[in-house]
Amino acid sequence: MSKVEFNKETGPREVFCGLTSIVWLHRRMPDAFFLVVGSRTCAHLIQSAAGVMIFAEPRFGTAILEEKDLAGLADAHEELDRVVNDLISRRPEIKTLFLVGSCPSEVIKLDLATVAEKLNKRFLGKIKFVNYSGSGIETTFTQGEDGALKALIPLMEDSNEEKLLLVGTLANNVEDRFKKIFRNLGISNVESFPPRQSTELPKIGKNTKVLLTQPYLSDTVRDLKHRGCEIISAPFPLGIEGSTKWFLAAAKAFKISALKVHEIISPLISRAKLALESHKDILKGKRLFLLPESQLEISLARFLHNECEMDLIEIGTPYLNKDLMKEEINLLPDNTKIVEGQHVEKQLDRVREANPDLVVCGMGLANPLEAEGISTKWSIEMVFSPIHGIDQAADLAGLFSKPLRRNQILTSKTLVTN
């Protein structure tokens, strides 16, 4: 492991809650429905993040907890039962219904696990009911996916068939390209979790080799290990370097030579390096500060330093699983500072003192920092954009070069005007 400085902070934090992950999960599994048990604030958050009007009947909704529910003057379980019945009568195509806890439901100790169990007995397998927490008390926004996948693992049947399981949501076109590369390598049995249909859960067992596509799935990994799966240790497939080592790790697990991997991906690498150059010209030598929100921060920092030659000031991450991130940390330069957790006021003080060229942060901090003359990039964009893989390296770099390019244009126009 490289000589990295690890620190831990506690205090006030500024992050989205785990409900936000519903935005990409409901698109991934169109036969599923996500029912948040929460407040009107929860409903507004998801609707705004998804950019979908509620009358368009998206595959998510909110069972609103009113003041009488929070005060204990009504039986919230009965009300939830009624809402579920109404929902299923209107949307008979639902195959899996996720009951998603929120801050309000956690506060009043609403037992969604028991509710899901009762509903499963009543509907006798016609619809599967699972539950997880998206509460901001417990989770940051990407951890919502971790909770959802963990909830699905008990539904996955056993199998001793040898397979590669890609774990973590990917854009469909990125997933298709990955599977094509694996087929060319000779790994034909490749499945994804979550699948594109909630009813098509992969079977798992001792011959299942798990390759993570996202770094925020600690609980999911632990439960897959308990089911006998082998976890392949690898960096994450962001950028040329991370993606190459990711493919090499998979090939090694299936006893495929590194020579064959390089033979297949070399054309992709050549094209990606060429496409990366224009962004590298802008990013090279720029100073970067990453505030914690998505758990993608370490992988992004590795890519931006090693492939775009940015200078790292500080990498913040909400949580740090050193086992999952070991291969990423090994690729960081010596003396890199990683801060787990957050005391937002102290971190903002360090940002102002360092005066970086670019800050990766949550939406709530971006505008105030921009007002102080500091260029920012929303970290949530990394989750909504197809950034994985060798051929997406230039697009990933472009997300960071864009605000710097914009800043250069605005500065030059200001100088001309003056």
From Swiss-Prot:
Keyword Transport: no
Top-level taxon of the source organism: Bacteria
Enzyme Commission numbers on file: 1.3.7.7
Keywords: 4Fe-4S, ATP-binding, Chlorophyll biosynthesis, Iron, Iron-sulfur, Metal-binding, Nucleotide-binding, Oxidoreductase, Photosynthesis
SUPFAM superfamilies tied to this protein: Helical backbone' metal receptor
Name under which the protein is recorded: Light-independent protochlorophyllide reductase subunit N
Transmembrane regions: none
Cofactor binding mode and count: Binds 1 [4Fe-4S] cluster per heterodimer. The cluster is bound at the heterodimer interface by residues from both subunits.
GO MF, any single term: oxidoreductase activity, acting on the CH-CH group of donors, iron-sulfur protein as acceptor
Cofactor dependence: [4Fe-4S] cluster
Catalysis performed (reactions): chlorophyllide a + oxidized 2[4Fe-4S]-[ferredoxin] + 2 ADP + 2 phosphate = protochlorophyllide a + reduced 2[4Fe-4S]-[ferredoxin] + 2 ATP + 2 H2O
Functional pathway: Porphyrin-containing compound metabolism; chlorophyll biosynthesis (light-independent)
Subunit structure: Protochlorophyllide reductase is composed of three subunits; ChlL, ChlN and ChlB. Forms a heterotetramer of two ChlB and two ChlN subunits.
Family in the record: Belongs to the BchN/ChlN family.
